[in-house]
Amino acid sequence: MTTNANSVTIEKKSYHHGDLRAALIVEGLRLLAEHEADSLSLRELARRVGVSAPSVYRHFPDKEALMTALAEEGLKQLAADQREASDAAGGGEAGFAATGRAYVRFALANPALFRLIFTSPLIARYRRNNPEQPEAMTFLLANAAASAGAEQGSPEARRAAIEAWALVHGLAMLILDGQLPADDAMIDAIC
């Protein structure tokens, strides 16, 4: 198992019957580490995995299906990063702050994946179709409620959650768009 320069964990496995979908997702994440989502093609993905283009279409009927799967995988990785950061900080308020810093750092380490997750219409459709799926936003929002001392689901918890998410998401986007420098000290101070 390796970690690419953009912090997404990637298992190195050669393709064999039965795991082509997983291999396509892993290679798709690698491609996103190199290029923006718009330039990713199913044909290029097939070439890099070493399979024919038609075999890709058995798992992903179109580019949108692949992008949705990559966004879903990105959300899982972001949620895992946030959980790990919260646990490492000992939970509570320190853990909550750590989840925010993990969110921003994930965005900086995985800019194309982060933009795919949060700026494409795919994620809204994914969330509508998978409301029970745990994901990064759910983790951050639940921690915001706990940190604010509010009962989960209450108006106070919702307000705290939206404020927390807006802060870290806005900071991440400002840095990604070049409006602010990627400065660890600033991220630590704000989050």
Residue ranges of model-derived segments:
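N-terminal intrinsically disordered/low-complexity leader segments
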Residues: 1-19, 30, 89
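Helix-turn-helix
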Residues: 23, 27, 31-65, 69
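Short, hydrophobic secondary-structure boundary micro-motifs
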Residues: 41, 115-117, 125-126, 177, ...
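Amphipathic alpha-helical packing segments from all-alpha helical-bundle domains
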Residues: 125-150, 155-163, 188-191
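Amphipathic C-terminal alpha-helical segment
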Residues: 146, 165-183
